[in-house]
Amino acid sequence: VPFLLAFGANLLFSFSATLFTDFSREVSGKWINSFKLCIAFICFALTAVVLGESPVWSIAPYFLLSGALGLFCADHFLCTAFAKLGSARTLMIFSFSPLFVATWSFFLFNEEPSYSKLIAIFFFIACVFTLSIEKFRKEGHWEIPGLLMALFGIVLDGLGNVTTRYALNINPNESVMNVCALRALGAFLGFLLFQPILKTRLIADFKKLSRRKKVIVLIASTIGTYVSLTFWISAVKIGNLTSLIALSGTTPLLAGTFEIAMGKTKATSYLAYAFVLFLIGFYFLIKN
């Protein structure tokens, strides 16, 4: 169940990321990140009001911090990288995230990944390496600033996930919606804090979009944050964090597939090899 929830979250985010890339290039990375986190905050706030659940306030600061790190800071770097690398190439770096999270989880939660999980991580990284070679052979160079932006995004996203899991270990009974709402609030507060520096023209730039693009960005922001995060936190609450993060290796493959389906790029033999590596890795990931 946790793997299916995590895969669902990755599927939705990968699809949304291909659309976020368009807006990162057309407007800016900081704009699409700020816009989608505001949509997430509104959706989760409304859901929290409707459900009427009261959060455990003693652990609320952890979720606020997690949201600020993962949903605001990490996604700011990722959306900036989208404009430079594209969604698939940016998300491919996420397959290295298990190495960071496994280390933190080992020291904080005593989570020791099994040998099959380690093998899965190896194949996911091989999947990323395959896509990396394609980028280099096609363009003859590495997009260093974009890669660094993506790397910063990974580290901050991993810290956000570890912080969330730490708080859930303190109180496993906290509801998924409360966790999501508090994380979204943390991201929104981060946006308000840094707005004088970022100077994001949230409403003005939105008004400049065509009616069709307004609908697209609203739908992408909703499924890429509200729905995707609900699935992801549900998985984190009941699953092994390192294994779930390893499954994020699916995101570049999924994003690449969506890019092909939407006519943004062409299918290549590298993508086919990456798909095979992913299937092998996924087999070891779910193997007992």
Q: PLM ranges: what are they?
A:
Residues 42-44, 103-106, 116-135, 270-287:
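Hydrophobic transmembrane alpha-helices of multi-pass small-molecule transport proteins
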Residues 30, 88, 114, 174-177, ...:
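Residues that define the loop-to-transmembrane-helix transition and helix capping
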Residues 1-31, 35-65, 75-85, 133-151, ...:
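Membrane-interface interhelical linkers
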Residues 14, 45, 68-72, 98-103, ...:
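Hydrophobic/small/kink-forming positions within alpha-helical transmembrane segments
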